[in-house]
From Swiss-Prot:
The keyword Coiled coil applies. Its cofactor is pyridoxal 5'-phosphate. Pathway: Amino-acid metabolism. It catalyses: L-tyrosine + H(+) = tyramine + CO2; L-dopa + H(+) = dopamine + CO2. Keywords: Coiled coil, Decarboxylase, Lyase, Pyridoxal phosphate. Disulfide bonds: none annotated. This is L-tyrosine decarboxylase. GO terms for biological process: L-dopa metabolic process. It comes from Enterococcus faecium (Streptococcus faecium). The gene is tdc. Its EC number is 4.1.1.25, 4.1.1.-.
Amino acid sequence: MKDMDIKAVFIGDKAENGPVYKMLLNKMVDEHLGWRENYIPSDMPAISEGDKLTPDYLATRDHMIEVLDEVSQRLRAGSIPWHSAGRYWGQMNAETLMPALLAYNYAMLWNPNNVALESSMATSQMEAEVGQDFASLFNMADGWGHIAADGSIANLEGLWYARCIKSIPLAVKEVLPEKVKNMSEWALLNLSVEEILEMTESFTDEEMDEVKAASSRSGKNIQKLGKWLVPQTKHYSWMKALDICGVGLDQMVAIPVQEDYRMDINALEKTIRELADQKIPILGVVAVVGTTEEGQVDSVDKIIQLREKLKDEGIYFYLHVDAAYGGYARSLFLNEAGEFVPYASLAEFFEEHHVFHHYVTIDKEVYEGFRAISEADSVTIDPHKMGYVPYAAGGIVIKHKNMRNIISYFAPYVFEKSVKAPDMLGAYILEGSKAGATAAAVWTAHRVLPLNVTGYGQLIGASIEAAQRFREFLEQLHFTVKGKTIEVYPLNHPDFNMVNWVFKVQDCTDLNAINELNEKMFDRSSYMDGDVYGERFITSHTTFTQEDYGDSPIRFIERMGLSKEEWQKEQQITLLRAAIMTPYLNDDRIFNFYTKEIAKAMEKKLNEIIK
């Protein structure tokens, strides 16, 4: 199929596709019931017609119905309507894909466990294919991936890979010293992933087991592996990962971000060189594609260039890209053959595939950041974010399939004798039991919406277009409330689809008062104000503190007419925050309707707040 209509793959804001969903769900349930009935039909039924007429049976059935009625009532009363086409402007939540929901519902009836092939033959194969989808999305020809519970687990696994691989040369020096003779400890700690994998390829299976036993999994030499460098915009899961992996929070170094909230590459190089001068190695660097609070895209290409430059000087680091939020957006740049389209051809490419309905800008720096992900050693990607599939579905992909043999807990030669395809996941991942229904959901989503411009590119293009238009809408917005003019200041041009903004009383130069106003707006526009089902505008918020962000917000502070001194006094700013994931707002009719509606809702809330 050339280009898809994304309105056909969601249940719909007003359940417009509800009849299709119900028809397909009933069809699939009927097929499952028939599958049960047709399994050795001559077997005696375990539940007889007489059983179904007994008082205890009937009472139990009625009690079950009552409990499920309560579940329905509690979910309807206590859930946030983020399916809305234009009322919800908050967290990374939106409509989920109808095919993914149906596949999850259907596969759940079999309750497959993807940790073992014997309990999930169908869905284990699906997960293997999803892992290959991830590798193809990032143009990693030798890559391998799998689904994880979430991005935090995937990040933890990325650090696990980095720690284990970095420790292998020291383990080789201990148990097979002849393999690394004449190499200093510094040289061993600065070997590339490819050099380490090439070294281990010559080992026998027994030698490899010895080396792994002496690696970081033994607890030895972990503090020798060096620092873990993250941007100030890091996700909080990295602190937990450093703790759990035994690397320690003291080994984490936060690299400053620029005014555009991307990692400062000059600061990164300076930090690495200062550490190298002290003979402190770099365990790894994290780049973020789609930061949690701002949606920004770090310059992965410049980090790769820096790594190549430093490699010539005998300094090397593992690179993990945390693309939990932004990873799926790489589909936007891939043609149907999976090729990354040149930047010079991008405008024509988007026009050919009708990606955008209005003028949308994709910065060259953002484009290059996405392009360079293919050079990372591992990448986090979350289907339950921009993949629009149900929770819980994170994911990770590694650049070289052989990397997994470094972290495996069962010798691959044992599994390969008894397990052909797909691979026995349990040997290579952090998790144990895992839902096969998740694999079915992600696999189905990837087949209905290919990971290129004709599929996910259409969906994510709609999201990016809506974000840029929403920011333009906010820029032009102002209100007159009780004789005061309320201005709206969007943060920055979004690299992706996140928009942050601040409400401010005109001529107010008191940052504390501005923060209070925006805290109150959040309280009035979220679950903090109680039941949100009747809310006409729902949003989220965040706080940029000097402790976390340094002085990167100063430019924004000054744009609002405040002084640097005011920032230094308060050292934090509260912003309203929206991940624009709704798939419908690239439609002019819908965009115009909802922007008018939420402007009215904003004005009403401001009238309630402003004294």
